[in-house]
A protein has these predicted regions:
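P-loop NTPase Walker
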Residues: 1-111
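ATP-hydrolysis module of ASCE/P-loop NTPase motor domains
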Residues: 88-90, 109-138
Length: 138
């Protein structure tokens, strides 16, 4: 654990007043609306650090969702660069699709079903769609 003032001095000295408020808001949602390059990811990463190091929230109790794989990788990389390895591997950085796939896979395990496979081969997808169309149009 780290006291609030030490954390803010070490990791958040470059943030403005509204960004600091977002970092320190732990209970409830925080909405960050700003133009690209304004520091949204920096605020989120700093907020994660604040939750872990100042509030004592366990990394297993934090889920960070993004829309794209690139954003997920960027956020995880930035967290690791700023805060090191201590919590990096325990935090969940996922896309919305990624967390949904994980929930489905875990549910499948719970009921004794094997995990599904994501089809990415376009030829296989086209063949399956053709079979479905033929079956349903006959």
């Amino acid at each position: 654990m780290m006291d609030r003032d030490s954390f803010l001095q070490k990791y958040a000295g470059h943030l403005n007043e509204k960004q600091l408020a977002a970092v320190q808001t732990v209970n409830g949602p925080v909405l960050l609306l700003a133009v690209p390059g304004s520091g949204k990811t920096t605020v989120l990463v700093t907020r994660l650090g604040y939750m872990l190091y100042c509030e004592g929230i366990r990394p297993e109790n934090i889920l960070t969702l993004t829309y794209t794989v690139a954003a997920t990788k960027d956020m995880a990389r930035r967290f690791r660069e700023i805060f090191g390895e201590e919590y990096s591997n325990a935090l969940e950085f996922r896309t919305i699709n990624g967390i949904c796939a994980r929930v489905i896979a875990r549910y499948g395990q719970m009921i004794g079903k094997s995990a599904f496979e994501l089809l990415t081969d376009e030829k296989v997808i086209l063949r399956m769609l053709t079979e479905i169309l033929v079956q349903n149009l006959s």
